[in-house]
Amino acid sequence: RSTLFPYTTLFRSALAELMDMARDSLETKRKVLEQLTDSDISLYPYTKFYLRDIKKRFNEYWKNHFSTIGLIGTNEAALNLLGVDIGTEKGKAFAEKTLDFMRDRLVEYQKETGNNYNLEATPAEGTTYRLAQIDKASFPDRAHFANGLGAAVKHPFYTNSSHLPVNYTDDLFELMDLQDNLQTKYTGGTVIHFFLGERMDDPQTLKKLVKTICENYKLPYFTFTPSFSICTNHGYIVGEHPECPNCGEATEVYSRVVGFLRPVAQWNNGKQAEFDMREHYDDAAEHQ
């Protein structure tokens, strides 16, 4: 989150320090969780039963579970440090080096602790907004956000993990060309969401598009996320309709906040600002 230091020196040092803090926290949590599971009055009785064979083998219930470290705002870090986004050659190289550095450090953590670690594109629905607010207060004149620069941004937020901004392009193939290599660097969960204004009615079109993506790209997970609305009187409505087209009553508009479908009105202010920026890929999808 630094806006001052070159990547090759203090930025990497600061990143390593934050990762070490995360490791220490995760190791403490793992020990506490193990104690709570192993106690005579276990707080996790069903999990204790389910993991009983792991306990017999390793003398630990949670030995096969991963400690996860993620990141947010890679695109904005590149803007702050280099003056370019990660859609550029220079910015993309920065993102790749950052992820490689984190992967290598996680391998060292595994060797040091004997526990599994992975690098994940964590959902971070709240963190992308909360940390942006902190940086807005700390660096009001120069902090880059996914939706603008500095104190003028009403509800700042950061992009998730190493994603491009949701309004970067309306061409899903351009998006995949720029993101494919980054997506494969995660050792935990990661996903690209293709936001659609409404559902795709032709299953054959969707089938063809999925086949094209799987045959030409390496990214591990992707979703097609249409928006829809729910009216208390008329039920499911295709697309984004704040008011029911049939009766005029207010509806609940649903979309994927990051990992789950939730009413947009229940999202935090940062995520609502992101929703308003989202490009839809309906045209690209339908022309397959």
Q: Which ranges hold each PLM region?
A:
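Short, small-residue-biased leader/transition segments that mark boundaries at the very start
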Residues: 3-10
